[in-house]
Amino acid sequence: MSRALAAVGVAALTAAFSLFGQPLARADPDTCPPNCDRIPASAWIDPAAIPLDTSYAWPSPAGVAVFLQRPRFRFEEMCASPPTADDPRDFAVAAKANLANPPGQWQLQVQVLHWRGDSWYGGQLADQVLRSAATALRACRLSAPSTSPSITTDEPGRLSSVLSVAGAAPTVLHSYLVSHPQSGTVAELAMWASSPSAENWPVIPDAQVLDALVAPLCAGYIASCR
């Protein structure tokens, strides 16, 4: 599809997702071509690379992930972020893995979002979603005055933050987001706990977690990084 035709067909593509839901194409469960109707098992972060794995022995997110429509990031719930008009996530192929622990322990959420079709277009959407996330984080205190967001990494395709919530149930959230324009994919890792938490947060560079999120996407979406 040429870029001109793609631009004309955007509205039709969005309508098709709204009317028919999940596309009919099928693919191998472990890997996917760029045009894929699910999140492949190989696209998820290695559980050993998730913070506090030595304490929690996280299972593979792929094993507990569920299909998701209109995904939103964890920080948006804590920030009470208002909906975004024409949000590209509304027609993304997405899945979410929630790994819950008892109160006081760290909770984990991992999401992967993918836009089907030409990678140049999906890549634009992925980058747009990440830029919008950075804007929403900066506006968090406007919609949720009890929050204190701190963006610790804000680079092209990479966003991490620490969000503290005051009040009767103080909470801290560590959030990591990456966009991967080569495959038209966004991945999120979010971990939160009541403050003070039962386990101390480890000293870990943002880049280490962000790299671990993006690393499997080349393998998961075959030919996307050639």
Feature locations, PLM:
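Secretory targeting and sorting signals
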Residues: M1-A27
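Processing junctions and N-termini across compartments
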Residues: G21, D30, F73, A134, ...
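N-terminal "mature-domain start" segment
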Residues: D28-K96, R226
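Residues that cap or initiate secondary-structure elements
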Residues: C36, R116-S119, G167-A169, S195
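Short Gly/Thr-rich strand-loop-strand
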Residues: A57, V64-A65, R70, R74, ...
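A short acidic-to-branched-hydrophobic micro-motif
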Residues: F91-D127
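Extracytoplasmic/secreted envelope proteins and their assembly/folding machinery
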Residues: G123-L130, L210-V214
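A short, solvent-exposed beta-edge/loop patch
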Residues: P145-R226
